[in-house]
């Protein structure tokens, strides 16, 4: 099949452009100390700093490939001749880094890429003293019109040939000195996926056939149909760099079968969450997590994909139907806080939108024919931040606590929000008073991603603050009681085993106390436990709720208790099948079922994390989900466009 049409050449050029973007991101990660590589910087014009999320993503990618290389070196250390065949190598510095580490030994590196990419790389190497000094025996081929070998040396060979042209690749590699029977690591780092699937399958097949003593290391995307996957695919479509294999091989199982069917005896497929948590030492994860301020845990977990060892036990019931809120305004914000001021009136504060931190509080108001959004004319000390809490209090007001303006600047302010009866309300704006509450006693340290829950105890009203994180503490487990009548942080007697430290969890009023569920725990591992803070005559007691079957661990979800059922919506989990829908937990019996969401009526990829939610009626039969989304790695920012509603009646009417 011909692969040199004008249209294909345009696509090839677009794919080559992904190399330039990738190497800039790798240089950024190296410059921030994620990994050591003094040679990458020689392949870019200048060092640019990428966002922490991108740096972490490229670190995991680099570390995973490096792990496979070291395993290969160890397994073949007794062999006199070993080879690395890097397909679509681009401006990778693999050879130069390994040479500097003294890790090559008897290893020869063969790099293959499009002729134009190889030509540019050869020119960079030949013009850079640091690079060419590592190749004292190099031979630069002058006539590159007739010879696909651009640089030849004893341990490094740079070849410019289209890997889809099997016969040409075979002839050129043989001419460059590749020994087909020698132990060889074939490396494809986000390369084959840009080819039409029949071509990438052919490459996997000929590698198995021609290199009988080889291992094939492939780093590639999976999960095309979840919201992140849809955003990622749209990004590459805009770049004219379609990801092809993703549709036919959407998960680790399909990729495993692919390699077996193409002639490989064994295939081990591991996603990057599994690699990050199971193969990296905790000390190394702590080192990396301390390099830069970071607060994008949802997208980081989604980006690394899924741990396939735990599958949700979906209930054999129809998915819950969700749909955009009737005549709802556009609210594209993540990390907001919400509170129900009165039936049909929802206050929204804080968060981050497309233009940065959202400085405008707003109110959603239910009318006869739909919902409208009114701006808030704030009087007093409004606090702007992300991941603050806003808790409804008796009388129609709310209390705002904590949050952050940046990962280095959290707050511990307590702000009382009340309506201002002295001012007339207009159709387009609502008058609210934001007043800092001066509190006595020892309060919690500044934090965000915590929970604040209203508890009534012995004729007093308390705001119960639990968990979260600070700029120095990755997770917190302390608990604090603020008496709203006395404006005093009160010491209360609490017995029982304290829940594990966490953030991005949920806490719901229940049984005179509250119930906490899930969150992100120590070391970045999602949790699936539930704890009941039960009132006693002398204070409170923590009790563990035994759930069966255990729900899939998750964080950045939302939850509400309706009667004896805790309804957990959305969030992020690190497992293979789909994305979180609704978990229904019976707090009396401990039974738990997972129910999927039918998102077919929502015309955009629905990302249910970093969002807020409220029940819309006293029976709890309908829930509204507002905001949510985030930065999708280097693929752009995706924010949910409109609030959506979930009809909870099917699950409330059933006995789970």
What do these predicted ranges mean?
Residues 88, 186-193:
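Short catalytic micro-motifs in class I SAM-dependent methyltransferases
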Residues 1-159, 166-167, 174-181:
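Rossmann-like AdoMet
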Residues 164-173, 194-212:
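A short, conserved alpha-helix within the catalytic core of class I
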Residues 310-656:
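Kelch-like beta-propeller repeat domains
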Residues 83, 108, 183-185, 215, ...:
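Structural motif
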Residues 115-117, 131-135, 143, 158-171, ...:
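Conserved, structured regulatory domains from eukaryotic proteins
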Residues 185-187, 206-225:
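Conserved beta-strand signature within the Rossmann-like core of class I S-adenosyl-L-methionine
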Residues 228-325:
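Rossmann-like AdoMet/SAM-dependent catalytic core
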